[in-house]
A protein has these predicted regions:
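C-terminal motif of bacterial Sec signal peptides marking the signal peptidase cleavage site
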Residues: 16-17
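Surface-exposed, glycine-biased beta-strand/turn segments
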Residues: 29-145, 152-154, 172-181, 186-187, ...
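Long, low-complexity serine/threonine/glycine- and acidic-rich segments characteristic of extracellular
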Residues: 186, 227, 242-397, 507, ...
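Short, structured interface segments
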Residues: 205-225, 390-392, 503-523
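Low-complexity, Pro/Ser/Thr- and charge-rich linker/hinge segments at domain boundaries
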Residues: 216-239, 246, 310-312, 394-414, ...
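Short coil/turn motif common to extracellular beta-sandwich-like domains
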Residues: 274-279, 464-470, 532-539
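Proteolytic processing hotspots in large secreted/extracellular or virion-associated proteins
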Residues: 399-401, 411, 440-487
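Proteolytic cleavage junctions
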Residues: 404-417, 462-463, 477-485, 489-550, ...
Length: 607
C-alpha cells in the first residue's frame, strides 16, 4: 500500500512553530525552516528516520504547491481610509456558507468613508433588511466586480438615484440595475458610508472582488496590503473510521479527537487503531494581529510517511456551491463541540473543486503497521503550523466512539426522493436535498407552550440539509377556523422560530432546510408600535414576537414617504421630505406581520 510502511520503533519529532514568523517560539533546536517552508531535519535525526522508515523503493516526498500566486496587483485600492484590519477572512467557515469576501474593521463605529476601489460604474444596487443590507456592486474596466456590503448610506449621485426609485416604486427594500455607464465612478471616489445593515453582527465593511465569471476571489491575492503578524494554529485532530459499513445510522462516522497539547502529539505517544480504513479532520484557526479575532484556513495538506493523503486550497469559489460547506466540515462535531472541524477527505457527494487526495482520503492500516502522519496549514502571508503524530495498527485497540443518537418512535431510511408519513405529518425529501443516505429518526413529544400540535422531533439538528424538504401537516377540523393565522414553528432549547406555511384545505404546507423540533401554532397578535420621536424626524420601536414584520407604510395625509427599517434594533425611522410644506398633517404608520396581523399609529403633525 502507498501509505503503509511498517517499522518497530517510533521517531520522536517536534514539529510545532514551523512558520516563517521569527517571533514565534520553537519547541525544537533540531528543526530549521528553509525558504520553501519544508521541514528540515538535523543530520542525526535524518539517519534515524532512514533506519526506521525506508521504503523498499524510494518514493519522492510530497511537496505542496500553491496554485495561484496572485492576480494583477495595484489595480484595486483599499476602499477605506487608513490601514486594513480584518475581522473576517475570505472563505472563512460560516453557519451554512463560505464567507465570500473580506470584512474590514471600522473601529466599532459606523460612518467611515467608503471609496471605489478602481474606476468603473455601478452595475447593481440593493437595499435589504437581510444579507448584505445596503450593498453596491461596481463593474471595472478589467471585467472584475467589487462588492461593498452593510453600508449605512449611499453618497452623491448614487444616493439620489436610489431615493428617486424608492419613491417611484414606493418601497424601502429595493434592487436596481443601472445601465452601463449611468453611474460612472473614479478610483478613490466616495460612494457610501460604512454601516451595520442587513445580517451584520457589528459595524464593518464587507468587501469582495469577483472575477468576470462571477466567482468570488480572495482580495489579498490582488495586492491589498494587511498587517499579518501571527501564524495559523492547529488546535485538534479528528480521526474517523471509514470502512464500507462504518457510516453510523445518524449519517456520521465513528471518531475520536486529539488535542495538539496531548501526549499523542506532544510526546508522540502512538495512537492505536484497529485495522481498517481511516480519514482525518482538523480544528485550526488563523489570526492576523490578535488571537481574539479568529479567522479561517485556506491552505492545508496531510501526508502519511511523506506521501500525500489529502490537500485543499481555496482562492475562489462559486456562490451556488456555498452551502456545500456542510460537506467540507464535520456537522456533527460542530453541533457537539461547538467547534468547526474541516474534513481532510472528500465525500462522494461533495462537488467542490478545491481538493487533491489519494485513495479518497483514506489511509489503510493493518495489524502491526505504524505510520507517521504530518499535517500542515498555511496562511496567505506564508506562515505555517504543523503537527506530527504516529498511528499503530493493533487488533486489540478500542473501537472509536459512535455518534450519539437519541430515542425515536420510528426510523426510516432516507435517500433521495423519499416520502415519510408519520401520524399527521408528511415529509418529502427531494433529490439532492441530503448529502448521503441515513436513518431518519422521528418522535412525537408533548405540546409546548403556545403551540397547538404536539412537537415533532424530526431527526437531529446537527444533520444538515442541502436544499429544502417539503413538510405537510393534516390540520384537525377544530383548528381550521384559524385560517391564514395557522403556521409552523421550529424550536431549540431557548427560542422559537417562525417557519411559515400555507393552508390548502385542511393541510398546512411549508418548506425547511433544517432538522429538529417542529410544531403547528398560530399568530393572531399584531405588531406593537411605540413612538420614540414624531416630528420632522421620526423614530418608532416596532416589534413582532412571532411571525415577524413583513411590511410597513409611512404616510403624510396618505401620501407615501420613505422610511427605513432596521430589524436588529426594531427601529423604523425617517425624515419628512422637504417637499412637504409647513402646515398641519396626519402622520400615519401601518405595520403588518407575516400572517397579515396589522397595527396602525396615527397622529396630527404640525410642521
Amino acid at each position: 500500500m502507498l501509505f503503509k510502511q511498517t517499522f518497530t520503533g517510533f521517531l520522536i519529532l517536534a514539529l510545532f512553530g514551523c512558520g516563517t514568523d521569527s517571533s514565534q517560539d520553537s519547541t525544537s533546536d533540531n528543526l530549521v525552516q528553509d525558504t520553501k517552508s519544508e521541514l528540515v531535519l538535523s543530520e542525526k535525526e535524518s539517519v534515524k528516520i532512514k533506519k526506521i522508515l525506508t521504503p523498499p523503493v524510494p518514493i519522492k516526498p510530497f511537496k505542496f504547491k500553491q496554485q495561484v500566486k496572485g492576480y494583477t496587483s495595484n489595480f484595486f485600492a483599499n476602499p477605506l481610509d487608513g490601514n486594513i484590519f480584518i475581522s473576517g477572512s475570505f472563505c472563512e467557515l460560516r453557519g451554512n456558507h463560505f464567507h465570500a469576501g473580506m470584512d474590514m474593521r471600522t473601529g466599532g463605529i459606523e460612518g467611515w468613508n467608503v471609496r471605489a476601489s478602481a474606476d468603473g460604474y455601478v452595475e447593481r444596487i440593493k437595499i435589504s433588511t437581510r444579507g448584505y443590507g445596503r450593498v453596491l456592486y461596481i463593474r471595472h474596466t478589467n471585467g472584475y466586480t467589487t462588492v461593498y456590503g452593510h453600508l449605512q448610506q449611499f453618497k452623491g449621485a448614487i444616493a439620489n438615484y436610489v431615493k428617486e426609485r424608492q419613491y417611484k416604486q414606493r418601497k424601502f427594500e429595493i434592487e436596481l440595475f443601472p445601465k452601463a455607464g449611468e453611474l460612472s465612478l473614479k478610483k478613490g471616489q466616495i460612494i457610501a458610508l460604512s454601516g451595520n445593515t442587513g445580517g451584520s453582527g457589528g459595524p464593518h465593511l464587507h468587501f469582495e472582488i469577483r472575477n468576470p465569471s462571477g466567482q468570488s476571489t480572495n482580495p489579498l491575492l490582488h495586492g491589498l496590503m494587511i498587517n499579518d503578524k501571527l501564524k495559523p494554529e492547529i488546535k485538534r485532530i479528528s480521526i474517523y473510521r471509514r470502512d464500507q459499513n462504518s457510516l453510523h445510522s445518524t449519517g456520521n462516522y465513528p471518531y475520536t479527537t486529539i488535542s495538539k497539547w496531548g501526549d499523542q502529539i506532544q510526546k508522540k505517544k502512538p495512537i492505536k487503531l484497529k485495522p481498517g480504513n481511516y480519514s482525518f479532520g482538523v480544528l485550526a484557526n488563523d489570526y492576523f494581529t490578535d488571537k481574539k479575532n479568529v479567522l479561517g484556513i485556506n491552505y492545508c495538506w496531510l501526508t502519511a510517511n511523506d506521501q500525500l493523503v489529502y490537500s485543499y486550497q481555496i482562492h475562489k469559489f462559486n456562490f451556488s456551491q456555498g452551502r456545500y460547506i456542510n460537506a467540507h466540515i464535520d456537522p456533527y462535531l460542530k453541533w457537539k463541540e461547538k467547534k468547526i472541524y474541516v474534513r481532510l477527505f472528500k465525500e462522494p457527494f461533495n462537488p467542490l473543486p478545491y481538493y487533491q487526495q489519494k485513495n479518497k482520503g483514506n489511509l489503510t492500516i493493518s495489524d502491526g503497521d505504524s505510520v507517521i502522519m504530518r499535517l500542515y496549514i498555511k496562511d496567505y502571508a506564508g506562515m505555517m503550523d504543523s503537527v506530527l503524530w504516529v498511528l499503530h495498527g493493533d487488533k486489540n485497540a478500542s473501537e472509536l466512539a459512535k455518534p450519539v443518537g437519541g430515542i425515536s418512535d420510528e426510523v426510516k431510511q432516507v435517500k433521495n426522493n423519499t416520502r415519510i408519513q408519520f401520524y399527521e405529518w408528511d415529509i418529502n425529501v427531494p433529490k439532492k436535498s441530503i448529502y448521503h443516505p441515513f436513518d431518519f429518526k422521528l418522535k412525537i413529544k408533548n405540546v409546548k407552550s403556545g403551540m397547538l400540535s404536539k412537537t415533532l422531533q424530526m431527526h437531529y439538528p446537527y444533520t444538515p440539509l442541502h436544499s429544502y424538504i417539503n413538510v405537510s401537516y393534516t390540520v384537525p377540523e377544530k383548528w381550521i377556523s384559524y385560517g391564514s393565522k395557522l403556521c409552523a414553528f421550529s424550536m431549540d432549547v431557548s427560542r422559537t422560530y417562525y417557519e411559515g406555511g400555507t393552508l390548502h384545505g385542511n393541510v398546512l404546507k411549508f418548506k425547511t432546510r433544517s432538522l429538529g423540533e417542529y410544531a403547528i401554532g398560530y399568530d393572531e397578535l399584531p405588531p406593537t408600535i411605540k413612538p420614540i420621536q414624531v416630528g420632522k424626524s421620526y423614530r418608532f420601536s416596532v416589534k413582532d414576537n412571532l411571525s415577524g414584520v413583513k411590511e410597513f407604510i409611512c404616510s403624510i395625509d396618505d401620501k407615501w414617504i420613505l422610511a427605513e427599517y432596521e430589524p436588529k434594533t426594531n427601529i423604523i425611522s425617517g425624515t419628512i421630505p422637504n417637499w412637504i410644506k409647513p402646515g398641519e398633517y396626519i402622520f400615519k404608520l401601518i405595520v403588518k406581520d407575516n400572517r397579515g396581523n396589522t397595527s396602525k399609529f396615527q397622529r396630527k403633525l404640525i410642521l
